[in-house]
C-alpha cells in the first residue's frame, strides 16, 4: 500500500510552529515502519492544531482515535504516537478494501476508518459530495443529528462549496481538502494559498466506535 505514496509528496505552506515537530514525526514514523507518512502527519498537525502545543498539547487530536474524550492526551509526543498509529491503520484498511485514493485515506483520519469500509461496500469513490453524504447520513445520525442540521463553518473551502456550512456532529467532510493546502498528495506543484491562522481548524469529532 505504501507504494502508492509517491516519493515526490511534499509539504507546503507550513509555518515554523508546525515544522518544529518534524524531527519527532520522522522518528515516530520510522519507529512504526511508515517513514512515507511524514508529510501527511505534518499536514494533519497543521489542520488539527497549527502545531500550537502550548494551547493544544494533543497536536494531532489523537485522543478520539483511542476512544477517549477530546484532549485526553496531554503531550505532543503521545499525540504523534497515536496519530501515526491511527493514520497507519487507515492505510492498512484502505489496502484491505482496495482503495488507493489518498484523499479518501486522509479524510478517514477525521471520519474514522469506517469511512473506507463504507466507500468499498457502497462502491463509491471519495469526493467532496460523497464525503458530504457520509457526514449527513452516517456520522451525524450516529451522534444524534438525524435531521441534517447544519452549523456555520467559515473555512474558505466550505464557503466556496456551500456558503460555509457543515453538519452538526458530522465530523468535517472538508477535511481532506483542507489538508491538501499543506500536502501535495494530488501531484500538485505547491504554491497554494495558506489557510488563514485561526480559521476553522478541523477538529476531529467522531467517537472511535466510528474509526
Predicted segment positions?
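An acidic intrinsically disordered interaction segment
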Residues: 10-13, 43-50
Amino acid at each position: 500500500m505504501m507504494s502508492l505514496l509517491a516519493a515526490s509528496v511534499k509539504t507546503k505552506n507550513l509555518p515554523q510552529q508546525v515544522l518544529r515537530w518534524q524531527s519527532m514525526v520522522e522518528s515516530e514514523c520510522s519507529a512504526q515502519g511508515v517513514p512515507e507518512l511524514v508529510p501527511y502527519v505534518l499536514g494533519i498537525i497543521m489542520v488539527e492544531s497549527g502545531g500550537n502545543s502550548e494551547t493544544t498539547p494533543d497536536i494531532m487530536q489523537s485522543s478520539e482515535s483511542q476512544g477517549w474524550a477530546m484532549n485526553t492526551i496531554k503531550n505532543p509526543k503521545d499525540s504523534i504516537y497515536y496519530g501515526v498509529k491511527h493514520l497507519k491503520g487507515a492505510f492498512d484498511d484502505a489496502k484491505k478494501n482496495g482503495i488507493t485514493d489518498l484523499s479518501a485515506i486522509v479524510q478517514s483520519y477525521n471520519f474514522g476508518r469506517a469511512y473506507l469500509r463504507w466507500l468499498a461496500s457502497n462502491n463509491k469513490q471519495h469526493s467532496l459530495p460523497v464525503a458530504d453524504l457520509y457526514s449527513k447520513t452516517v456520522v451525524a445520525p450516529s451522534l444524534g443529528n438525524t435531521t441534517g442540521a447544519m452549523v456555520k463553518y467559515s473555512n474558505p473551502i466550505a464557503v466556496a462549496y456551500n456558503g460555509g456550512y457543515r453538519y452538526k456532529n458530522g465530523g468535517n467532510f472538508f477535511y481532506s481538502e483542507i489538508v491538501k493546502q499543506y500536502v501535495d498528495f494530488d501531484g500538485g506543484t505547491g504554491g497554494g494559498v495558506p489557510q488563514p491562522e485561526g480559521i476553522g481548524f478541523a477538529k476531529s469529532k467522531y467517537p472511535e466506535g466510528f474509526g
